[in-house]
Amino acid sequence: TQIGGCLQCFSRYGAKFETGMHFIGSAAEGQTLRKLMKYLEIDNEITLSQLDPHGYDVVALQGKQYKFANGKDAFIQQMTEYFPHQHDNLVRYYELVEEIANASSLHSLKYAESDTSINTEYQLRSINEVIGEIISDSTLAKVLVGNLPLYAAELDKTPFSTHAFIMDFYNQSAFRIQGGSDTVATALAHTIQRYGGDVLARKKVTKIVCDDTRAVAVEVNDKVMIPCDYVISDAHPIRTLELLDTKLIRPVFRKRINQIPQTVGGFTVYLHFKDNTVPYLNYNYYGYQEDTPWNCEKYTEETWPKGFLYMHFCPKGEAKYASTGVILSYMQMKDVEKWKGTSVGRRGKDYEEFKRLKAEKLLAVLEQHFPGIRNNICKYYTSTPLTYLNYTGTEGGSMYGNAKDIHMGAACRVPQRTRIPNVY
């Protein structure tokens, strides 16, 4: 059917929704993602719409809203207006974020300037520890992690380097993709085809076939064999290893990969608005019900949802009003575990009622932040960690796959090269 994994979109009653990649960063001229788009020859097929540079992310905490502005000077100036006594600390914070990002050859595309020592240090120190050392205002320290749903950070676990990469990536510039993220998948397919490649849909890889030393083919749909020189898998590492029934992968490696913790799953409500009722939001909104963005993944039936991320879909052309939007909150796989093993659309009335109740609860919270929004929604649709598991194969229905934990160090890392020389 469709290609592109989480780049895919879906439509219901004429309304279009994105499933995964809702906005991108560092896509202005000369920036990292723009360079990659040009290299992949997709830049001319994709139309970007820049989010508000004065507040591309808005964090709502304890009844106040805080805007993240694009660019170092603008970001520091904006935050200093909220926290005048923290200016010097904000400069120190931002310079550290830049230093870590620039020291990554992958993040900066500047291999000669890579510096692994600083990244090694901040891969072993938690976000809250480092920010707590630099920022003396506890509220500002919380605001700076207000966008942590973008990477499902956990208190005392997620390394500061992860935070630095995300902050730098989006703070350089932030854009939505006009017409939907599936245009990226289509553009990538066009590039592959221009160079003589084929893009195959409805072809599920069921096995990576190896001889005594290397991969020689992939089996598709349990029957068709496609010979290969190289295999590059973008599936979850656990799913990839399941395809490799070979002694070339050591049992101890399989065990380590299977034991890596996963990021939390998500519950998503896709919103179809009534025509010309909801003004288009040119920013992302992070709302919190308690006094901190931390620990939203630790909830009870009564306290859920502790936080949410709310965004609008960017239609083609200039739009004054939004047609669709999305609201996302954390959800643990255990909440839907009893329906595991059922198929999409056939999970039963109990599952549908579970989703309806969760959606209404999440919409009630959204109404607190945007009064009147509930009456402007004509239809909505939902997804759970089970949906992620079924459509993407991500372990435990996690939003971002493997989690990073400073206490596990290298045990959390997955090498891009396997012991099979032509499998990545």
Stretches with model-predicted labels:
Residues 1-96:
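N-terminal glycine-rich phosphate/pyrophosphate-binding loop and immediately adjacent elements
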Residues 47-49, 198-200, 378:
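General small-molecule cofactor/ligand-binding pocket signal
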Residues 61-158:
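Rossmann-like flavin
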Residues 62-63, 153-158, 209-216, 321-323:
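A short, glycine/Asx- and small/polar-enriched loop/turn
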Residues 139-155, 368-424:
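A glycine-rich dinucleotide-binding beta-alpha-beta segment and adjacent secondary-structure elements
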Residues 164-219:
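Helical element adjacent to the flavin cofactor pocket in flavoenzyme catalytic cores
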Residues 176, 206-320:
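Mid-domain catalytic core of redox enzymes
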Residues 274-386:
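C-terminal segments that line or cap access tunnels to active or ligand-binding sites in enzymes
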